[in-house]
Amino acid sequence: MASFVSFLVLLLAALILMPQGLATYYKPIKKPPVYKPPVYKPPVYKPPVYKPKPPVYKPKPPVYKPPYKKPPYKKPPYGKYPPVEDNTHA
């Protein structure tokens, strides 16, 4: 019985010493986040990036070519026998 009484005394002391008792665990109060203004950073100078421009398409100018004279060509007579000078079968 003495152990039961000492258990009750310890339980009562624990309940008195703990402000919330055995009801809930400690939960911190939720606070809204504190607004922090952004840190000012001076602008950093960056040199412009050099990008070569693609070449513009320009057609080459025409090259002058002197007129070409073809050698004369004798047309064979149509529907007739070849001339005597070209006939080698005679």
Swiss-Prot record:
Residues 46-65 have a biased composition (Pro residues). Residues 1-24 form the signal peptide. It comes from the Eukaryota. InterPro entries: Pistil_extensin, Proline-rich_CW_protein. It is found in: Secreted, Cell wall. Its main location: secreted. GO terms for cellular component: extracellular region. The lineage of its organism: Eukaryota, Viridiplantae, Streptophyta, Embryophyta, Tracheophyta. Keywords: Cell wall, Developmental protein, Repeat, Secreted, Signal. This is Repetitive proline-rich cell wall protein 3. The gene is PRP3. Belongs to the plant proline-rich protein superfamily. ENOD12 family.
